[in-house]
């Protein structure tokens, strides 16, 4: 077990609190380490492994959490039956408690979207671009809407329109003036997909909906939730309904799964339970120059006062100040020229190119 003095006062406060805790883990502050420590602490307090549920978003995150928990249990010399560990993704947790053997591939949804777009001539693109770009992005939109529990039988026009508008802000797939028309396409495609699905099986969003409909859902003493910023409304309801006490870790600034319904608004479902709120500020990954620059940048781009406060006091574990980052405003051709010049000077795997949308990747490539 890590010594108390090595954990830090912020983490220790979160670990020692007996009730529900909501941790804002800024990048590089060791959230997986903290979750694993919380698990070990609960076991040391006499909580049985079968009474603790751990939920995360991706299979990779699940494997990492499982690995960290096992390592720290061994380090703490805790004799625990590892077969009793309950570490799941949200979908694997739902599947484990449902008798749903016929899970369909996402390819069916893509096929239905493609056939509809071709038949109705919605876009004037060739097949290659439809298949590689438009269809996957429309699939993301469908998954996003369904993650809010929207189905053809439960279509709320106003709610669906509002969600489409929110999605449009982070995607250039839909022009504002086309939202009404697109809503009609969505309802038609959704209906066709549900009919096809009824013949072939259920999809992953159905797993969550069907799990929530169970009368006798499994109950635990504690639920540990990772990557809270990426949790959608259905997943938030599953986590909060699984135990009275939660230990949730996330960072609104790192929300990346908005297309699947992940929303910083779902933080509110957890804050309504009046947990202890703890902010982690000690960064073990970045230099102080990068932290100062990032804090200043994020503060200039957000109007949410609580999010701004989360950036106060970011401190590097590394004593080296490092090099101050620079922002250069330039046109596309100038940026491409700069990238090409850099590639000739350094190894290509030392350079990262990050853009806002998939269409921008196509332009740069």
Residue ranges and their predicted role:
Residues 80, 113, 120, 245-261, ...:
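Conserved phosphoryl-transfer catalytic core
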Residues 38-42, 65, 69, 238, ...:
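Hydrophobic residues on the short alpha-helix immediately C-terminal to a glycine-rich phosphate/catalytic loop
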Residues 51-143:
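Conserved P-loop NTPase-based nucleic-acid remodeling module centered on helicase motor cores
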Residues 101-184, 277, 283:
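ATP-hydrolysis module of ASCE/P-loop NTPase motor domains
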Residues 33-47:
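Walker A/P-loop NTP-binding motif
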Residues 58-59, 89-92, 249-253, 259-264, ...:
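A short beta-strand-to-loop transition that corresponds to the Sensor-1 phosphate-sensing loop
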Residues 2-24, 177-266, 282:
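Conserved helicase NTPase motor core
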């Amino acid at each position: 077990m890590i010594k108390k003095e090595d954990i830090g006062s912020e983490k220790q406060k979160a670990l020692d609190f007996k009730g529900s805790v909501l941790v804002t883990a800024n990048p590089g502050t060791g959230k997986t380490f903290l979750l694993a420590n919380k698990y070990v602490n609960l076991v040391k307090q006499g909580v049985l492994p079968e009474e603790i549920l751990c939920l995360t978003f991706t299979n990779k995150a699940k494997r990492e959490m499982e690995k960290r928990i096992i390592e720290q249990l061994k380090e703490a010399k805790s004799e625990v039956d590892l077969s009793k560990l309950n570490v799941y993704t949200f979908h694997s947790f739902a599947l484990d408690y449902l008798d749903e053997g016929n899970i369909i591939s996402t390819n069916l949804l893509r096929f239905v979207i493609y056939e509809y777009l071709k038949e109705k001539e919605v876009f004037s693109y060739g097949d290659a671009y439809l298949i590689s770009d438009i269809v996957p992005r429309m699939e993301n939109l469908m998954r996003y809407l369904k993650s809010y529990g929207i189905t053809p039988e439960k279509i709320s026009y106003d709610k669906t329109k509002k969600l489409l508008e929110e999605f449009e802000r982070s995607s250039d797939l839909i022009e504002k003036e086309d939202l009404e028309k697109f809503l009609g396409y969505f309802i038609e495609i959704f209906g066709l997909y549900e009919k096809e699905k009824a013949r072939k099986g259920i999809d992953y969003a159905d797993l969550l909906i069907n799990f929530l409909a169970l009368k006798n859902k499994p109950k635990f003493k504690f639920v540990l939730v990772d990557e809270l910023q990426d949790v959608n409304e259905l997943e938030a309801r599953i986590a909060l309904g699984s135990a009275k006490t939660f230990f949730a870790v996330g960072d609104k600034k790192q929300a990346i799964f908005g297309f699947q319904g992940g929303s910083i608004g779902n933080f509110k479902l957890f804050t309504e339970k009046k947990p202890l709120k703890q902010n982690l500020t000690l960064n073990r990954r970045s230099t102080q120059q990068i932290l100062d620059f990032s804090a200043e940048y994020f503060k200039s781009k957000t109007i949410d006062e609580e999010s701004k406060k989360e950036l106060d006091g970011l401190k590097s574990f590394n004593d080296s100040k490092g090099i101050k980052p620079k922002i250069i405003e330039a046109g596309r051709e100038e940026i491409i020229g700069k990238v090409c010049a850099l590639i000739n000077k350094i190894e290509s795997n030392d350079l990262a190119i990050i853009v806002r949308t998939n269409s921008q990747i196509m332009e740069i490539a």
